[in-house]
Amino acid sequence: VWLWMEFPFHDQFGGKDTGIDLVARTVEGEYWAIQCKCYAADTFINKPDVDTFLATSGKRFETEFGMTGFAQRLWISTTNKWNSTAEQTIRNQNPPVTRLNLIDLENDDVNWSSLEQGLFGVASRPKPFAIREHQQEAIDQAHAYFKIDEATGQPAHTRGKLIMACGTGKTFTSLRIAENETGGRGLVLFLVPSIALLGQTLRSWLQQSQEPMTAVCICSDPQVSKQTEKKDNDTTSVIDLALPASTDVPSIVKQLQHARRHNAEGLTVVFSTYQSIDVISRAQQQLLAETGGAFG
């Protein structure tokens, strides 16, 4: 991560007020443009606030490997309030925009006091939840249900259903079941009916995971996932997910191939909505073809 003035290629953008505060390079070698805004909690973000950032981060620049551009743009602010025009402006952008608002910072998996004391990484994270008795019972019963039959070498069951009451920790329990059944190393598909639930599950699993986890998000079709009408029950958009979501098959395959090479000791989890099952199928077929059936 670089401060903007320390970014090796910042001089190609000209001017002082570029709207970009930080630049991050991912493990895949992609560049992210990041804007950080410290606002009062009751401040509304307006379209002019985002225009400069979008204009600058949309430009291409030359690196030692040739011309490139920002693959993703991240807006971080200490308010939850957005003018409707500003919110519409950051949707459907290319490169895409995601945002972290005050509510995300407050609920993030970070002990802010630890950061202020100079602690980073695992040392700054709160302790994971302890498994409760009823959750352990569910984990044990799921393991027994899917146990390998010694005679056939195959699981006794390939499908099952776990029913738990509201507030009993279904999301957390499902994570511990996935970790237990894969030994913390494997490829998991998690399907949900809405982007809101996808975002909730994604954050919970990343926060509570006991093993290294690579998450790949596949959003539903744009007309559903980017629905913003107030009358709609699910107003969550892909711009509010903790990680970028995509329906681009080559991009999804690239992420999974990278996870296969670099996360052999952890879980790779594909989070998706039901609407994107066709995208998952096409990505899986391409991945199996590229790996000779060894992964996917």
Segments (PLM) and residue ranges:
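Conserved two-lobed SF2 helicase motor
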Residues: 263-281
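Loop/turn-to-beta-strand initiation segments
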Residues: 187, 265-269, 294
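Conserved Walker A/P-loop ATP-binding site and its immediately adjacent core
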Residues: 185-209, 214-228, 274-276
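ATP-dependent helicase/translocase motor core
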Residues: 1-3, 8-12, 60-168, 172-186, ...
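Switch/connector loops and helix/strand junctions flanking conserved nucleotide-binding motifs
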Residues: 42-46, 82-89, 198-201, 224-231, ...
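Catalytic centers of nucleases
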Residues: 1-67
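Conserved motor-coupling elements within RecA-like helicase/translocase cores
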Residues: 232-268
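SF2 helicase catalytic motif II
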Residues: 275-276, 288-296
